[in-house]
Amino acid sequence: MGLGLLQIGLTLCIVIAITPVLGRYIARVFLEERTILDPLMNPIERSIYVISGVRPKDDMTGWQYIRAILYTNLFMGILVYSLIHYQRLLPWNPNGFGVPRWDIILHTVVSFVTNTDQQHYAGETTLSYFSQVAALGFLMFTSAATGLAVGIAFIRGLTGKKLGNFYIDLTRGITRILLPISVIGAIALVLLGVPQTLGGSLTITTLEGGTQYIARGPVASFEMIKMLGENGGGFFAANSAHPFENPNGATNFIETIAMIAIPAAMIYTYGVFAKNIKQAWLLFWMVFIVFVILVWVAATGELQGNPLVNGTLGIEKPNLEGKELRFGWAETALWAVMTTATMCGAVNGMHDALMPQGLFATLFNLFLQIIWGGQGTGTAYLFIYLILTVFLTGLMVGRTPEIFGRKIEKREIVLASLILLVHPIVVLIPSAIALAYPYSLSGITNPGFHGISQVVYEYASASSNNGSGLEGLTDNSLWWNLSTSLSILVGRYVPIIAMLLLADSMSRKQTVPQTPGTLKTDSLLFTTVTAGIVLILGVLTFFPVLALGPIAEAFKLASGS
């Protein structure tokens, strides 16, 4: 127990230490201040702009920024769909894989282009190395950079600056942040035992005299951007539970830090943009405290173990079902909460085997989307709640709501409400449909309360662009591929459109001079109220689902049945 808690504590301390360093660096990149990579990257970026016809000094309006995102994402999706469809004709296919079904290709492309990386296939038996690295690997960089660009544009708008240029933000996000860190991280993973090869599967003879095929590939480079970009899609079906993706405690530590580094740093980046580091730290600690509570809930459940198993065996042991023993209960619980908090979606153990407390924590993260949140977009979601808090507190004291010196009016509240309503709509309605019809019900492997959790988790993971799943669900079917693709698209692009329109609206407003009655958003009291509103809205929206799923399952286990 002590060692497990020490591992969790050490990881969280490192997160706190690197947040201001990386947050300040990200701010310098997007404020176009000098960085250590300027001599190397400036010529490369200028060449990219010249070839693509981008004018770096041209700022975009909200709708221009939105159109740029939609057009580039559509183009990249069509390109990658074609590459996977024709993978049998392309190089780096030593295992001779053919063409997957059209619906699995569609779901995969939609999933990866949106930074969701929900996988209904096994990578080692479905996709060639070219499809994995050149196609999906390409989307891992661009989808992460797209989310990062949205977060930065949103921060710019709230702080009264122009939104910027999407193509510039996309390029700088890749060249200055994602690519350099991924290269360093991939080298570290190779040194620690993660394979990086274009050789085909190995054929070996087992001790019993049988034949076994061992899949391998260019895993290290794929793995690092998977974690750093909050992508989460694994090279292998077992994801980071596979010994080739995550062979030991050292690689697990690197991947855990990579997973949370940018979402945590983005809060500090806001503080630099707004010239209000105090508020950034208050928001950081608000999110951090809720995160630690959820880690404690999940870790306690795993440490106490399954009461039915322990009662039958007459021992008190942690829950080790679905765990890799090289990580144990503590690192698995921390990872499960972190991967759903950051919308990464990678797993180092099976979430389907989590105790109800752990399942509650992971679902809670997927429902709120702000406990760190996704790449860039998580920070934007956090400020949506901040805007609603200002609006509600303004109503209570009879003042016109203001934030960052700008009035919050009907348009902003309508857009903020739309952003928060999209997620429950594309989670709860498809879940109800899936639970009502025999065709979709056939994919559910657990008829009890856990079966409800399997369905809701699948759509919550899709809509929040997380991508993890309770893998007891048989999800590689036409229904699940198409329905989750729709949830992914709506859950990704409708909030992004509304966020950018809201930011554009705020950037155009005149600054209102501060008065003694102006609500200060950088106070402990206001931050506490924000946390309360976040939790209340989350509980009111999704508590019935939590009650029917993990809470009911916990009571059933406690009763001994």
From Swiss-Prot:
Membrane topology annotation: Multi-pass membrane protein
Protein name as catalogued: Potassium-transporting ATPase potassium-binding subunit
First and last residue of the signal peptide: none
Subcellular location field: Cell membrane
Naturally occurring in which organism (per UniProt): Anabaena sp. (strain L31)
Pfam families, A to Z: KdpA
Quaternary structure and partners: The system is composed of three essential subunits: KdpA, KdpB and KdpC.
Bilayer-crossing regions: 2-22, 65-85, 135-155, 177-197, 253-273, 280-300, 327-347, 353-373, 378-398, 413-433, 482-502, 531-551
Described purpose of this protein according to its UniProt entry: Part of the high-affinity ATP-driven potassium transport (or Kdp) system, which catalyzes the hydrolysis of ATP coupled with the electrogenic transport of potassium into the cytoplasm. This subunit binds the extracellular potassium ions and delivers the ions to the membrane domain of KdpB through an intramembrane tunnel.
One CC-aspect GO term: plasma membrane
Keyword Cell membrane found: yes
Stored InterPro entries: KdpA
PANTHER family with a match to the protein in the record: POTASSIUM-TRANSPORTING ATPASE A CHAIN, POTASSIUM-TRANSPORTING ATPASE POTASSIUM-BINDING SUBUNIT
Protein family (similarity comment): Belongs to the KdpA family.
UniProt GO molecular function: P-type potassium transmembrane transporter activity; potassium ion binding
Keywords annotated in UniProt: Cell membrane, Ion transport, Membrane, Potassium, Potassium transport, Transmembrane, Transmembrane helix, Transport
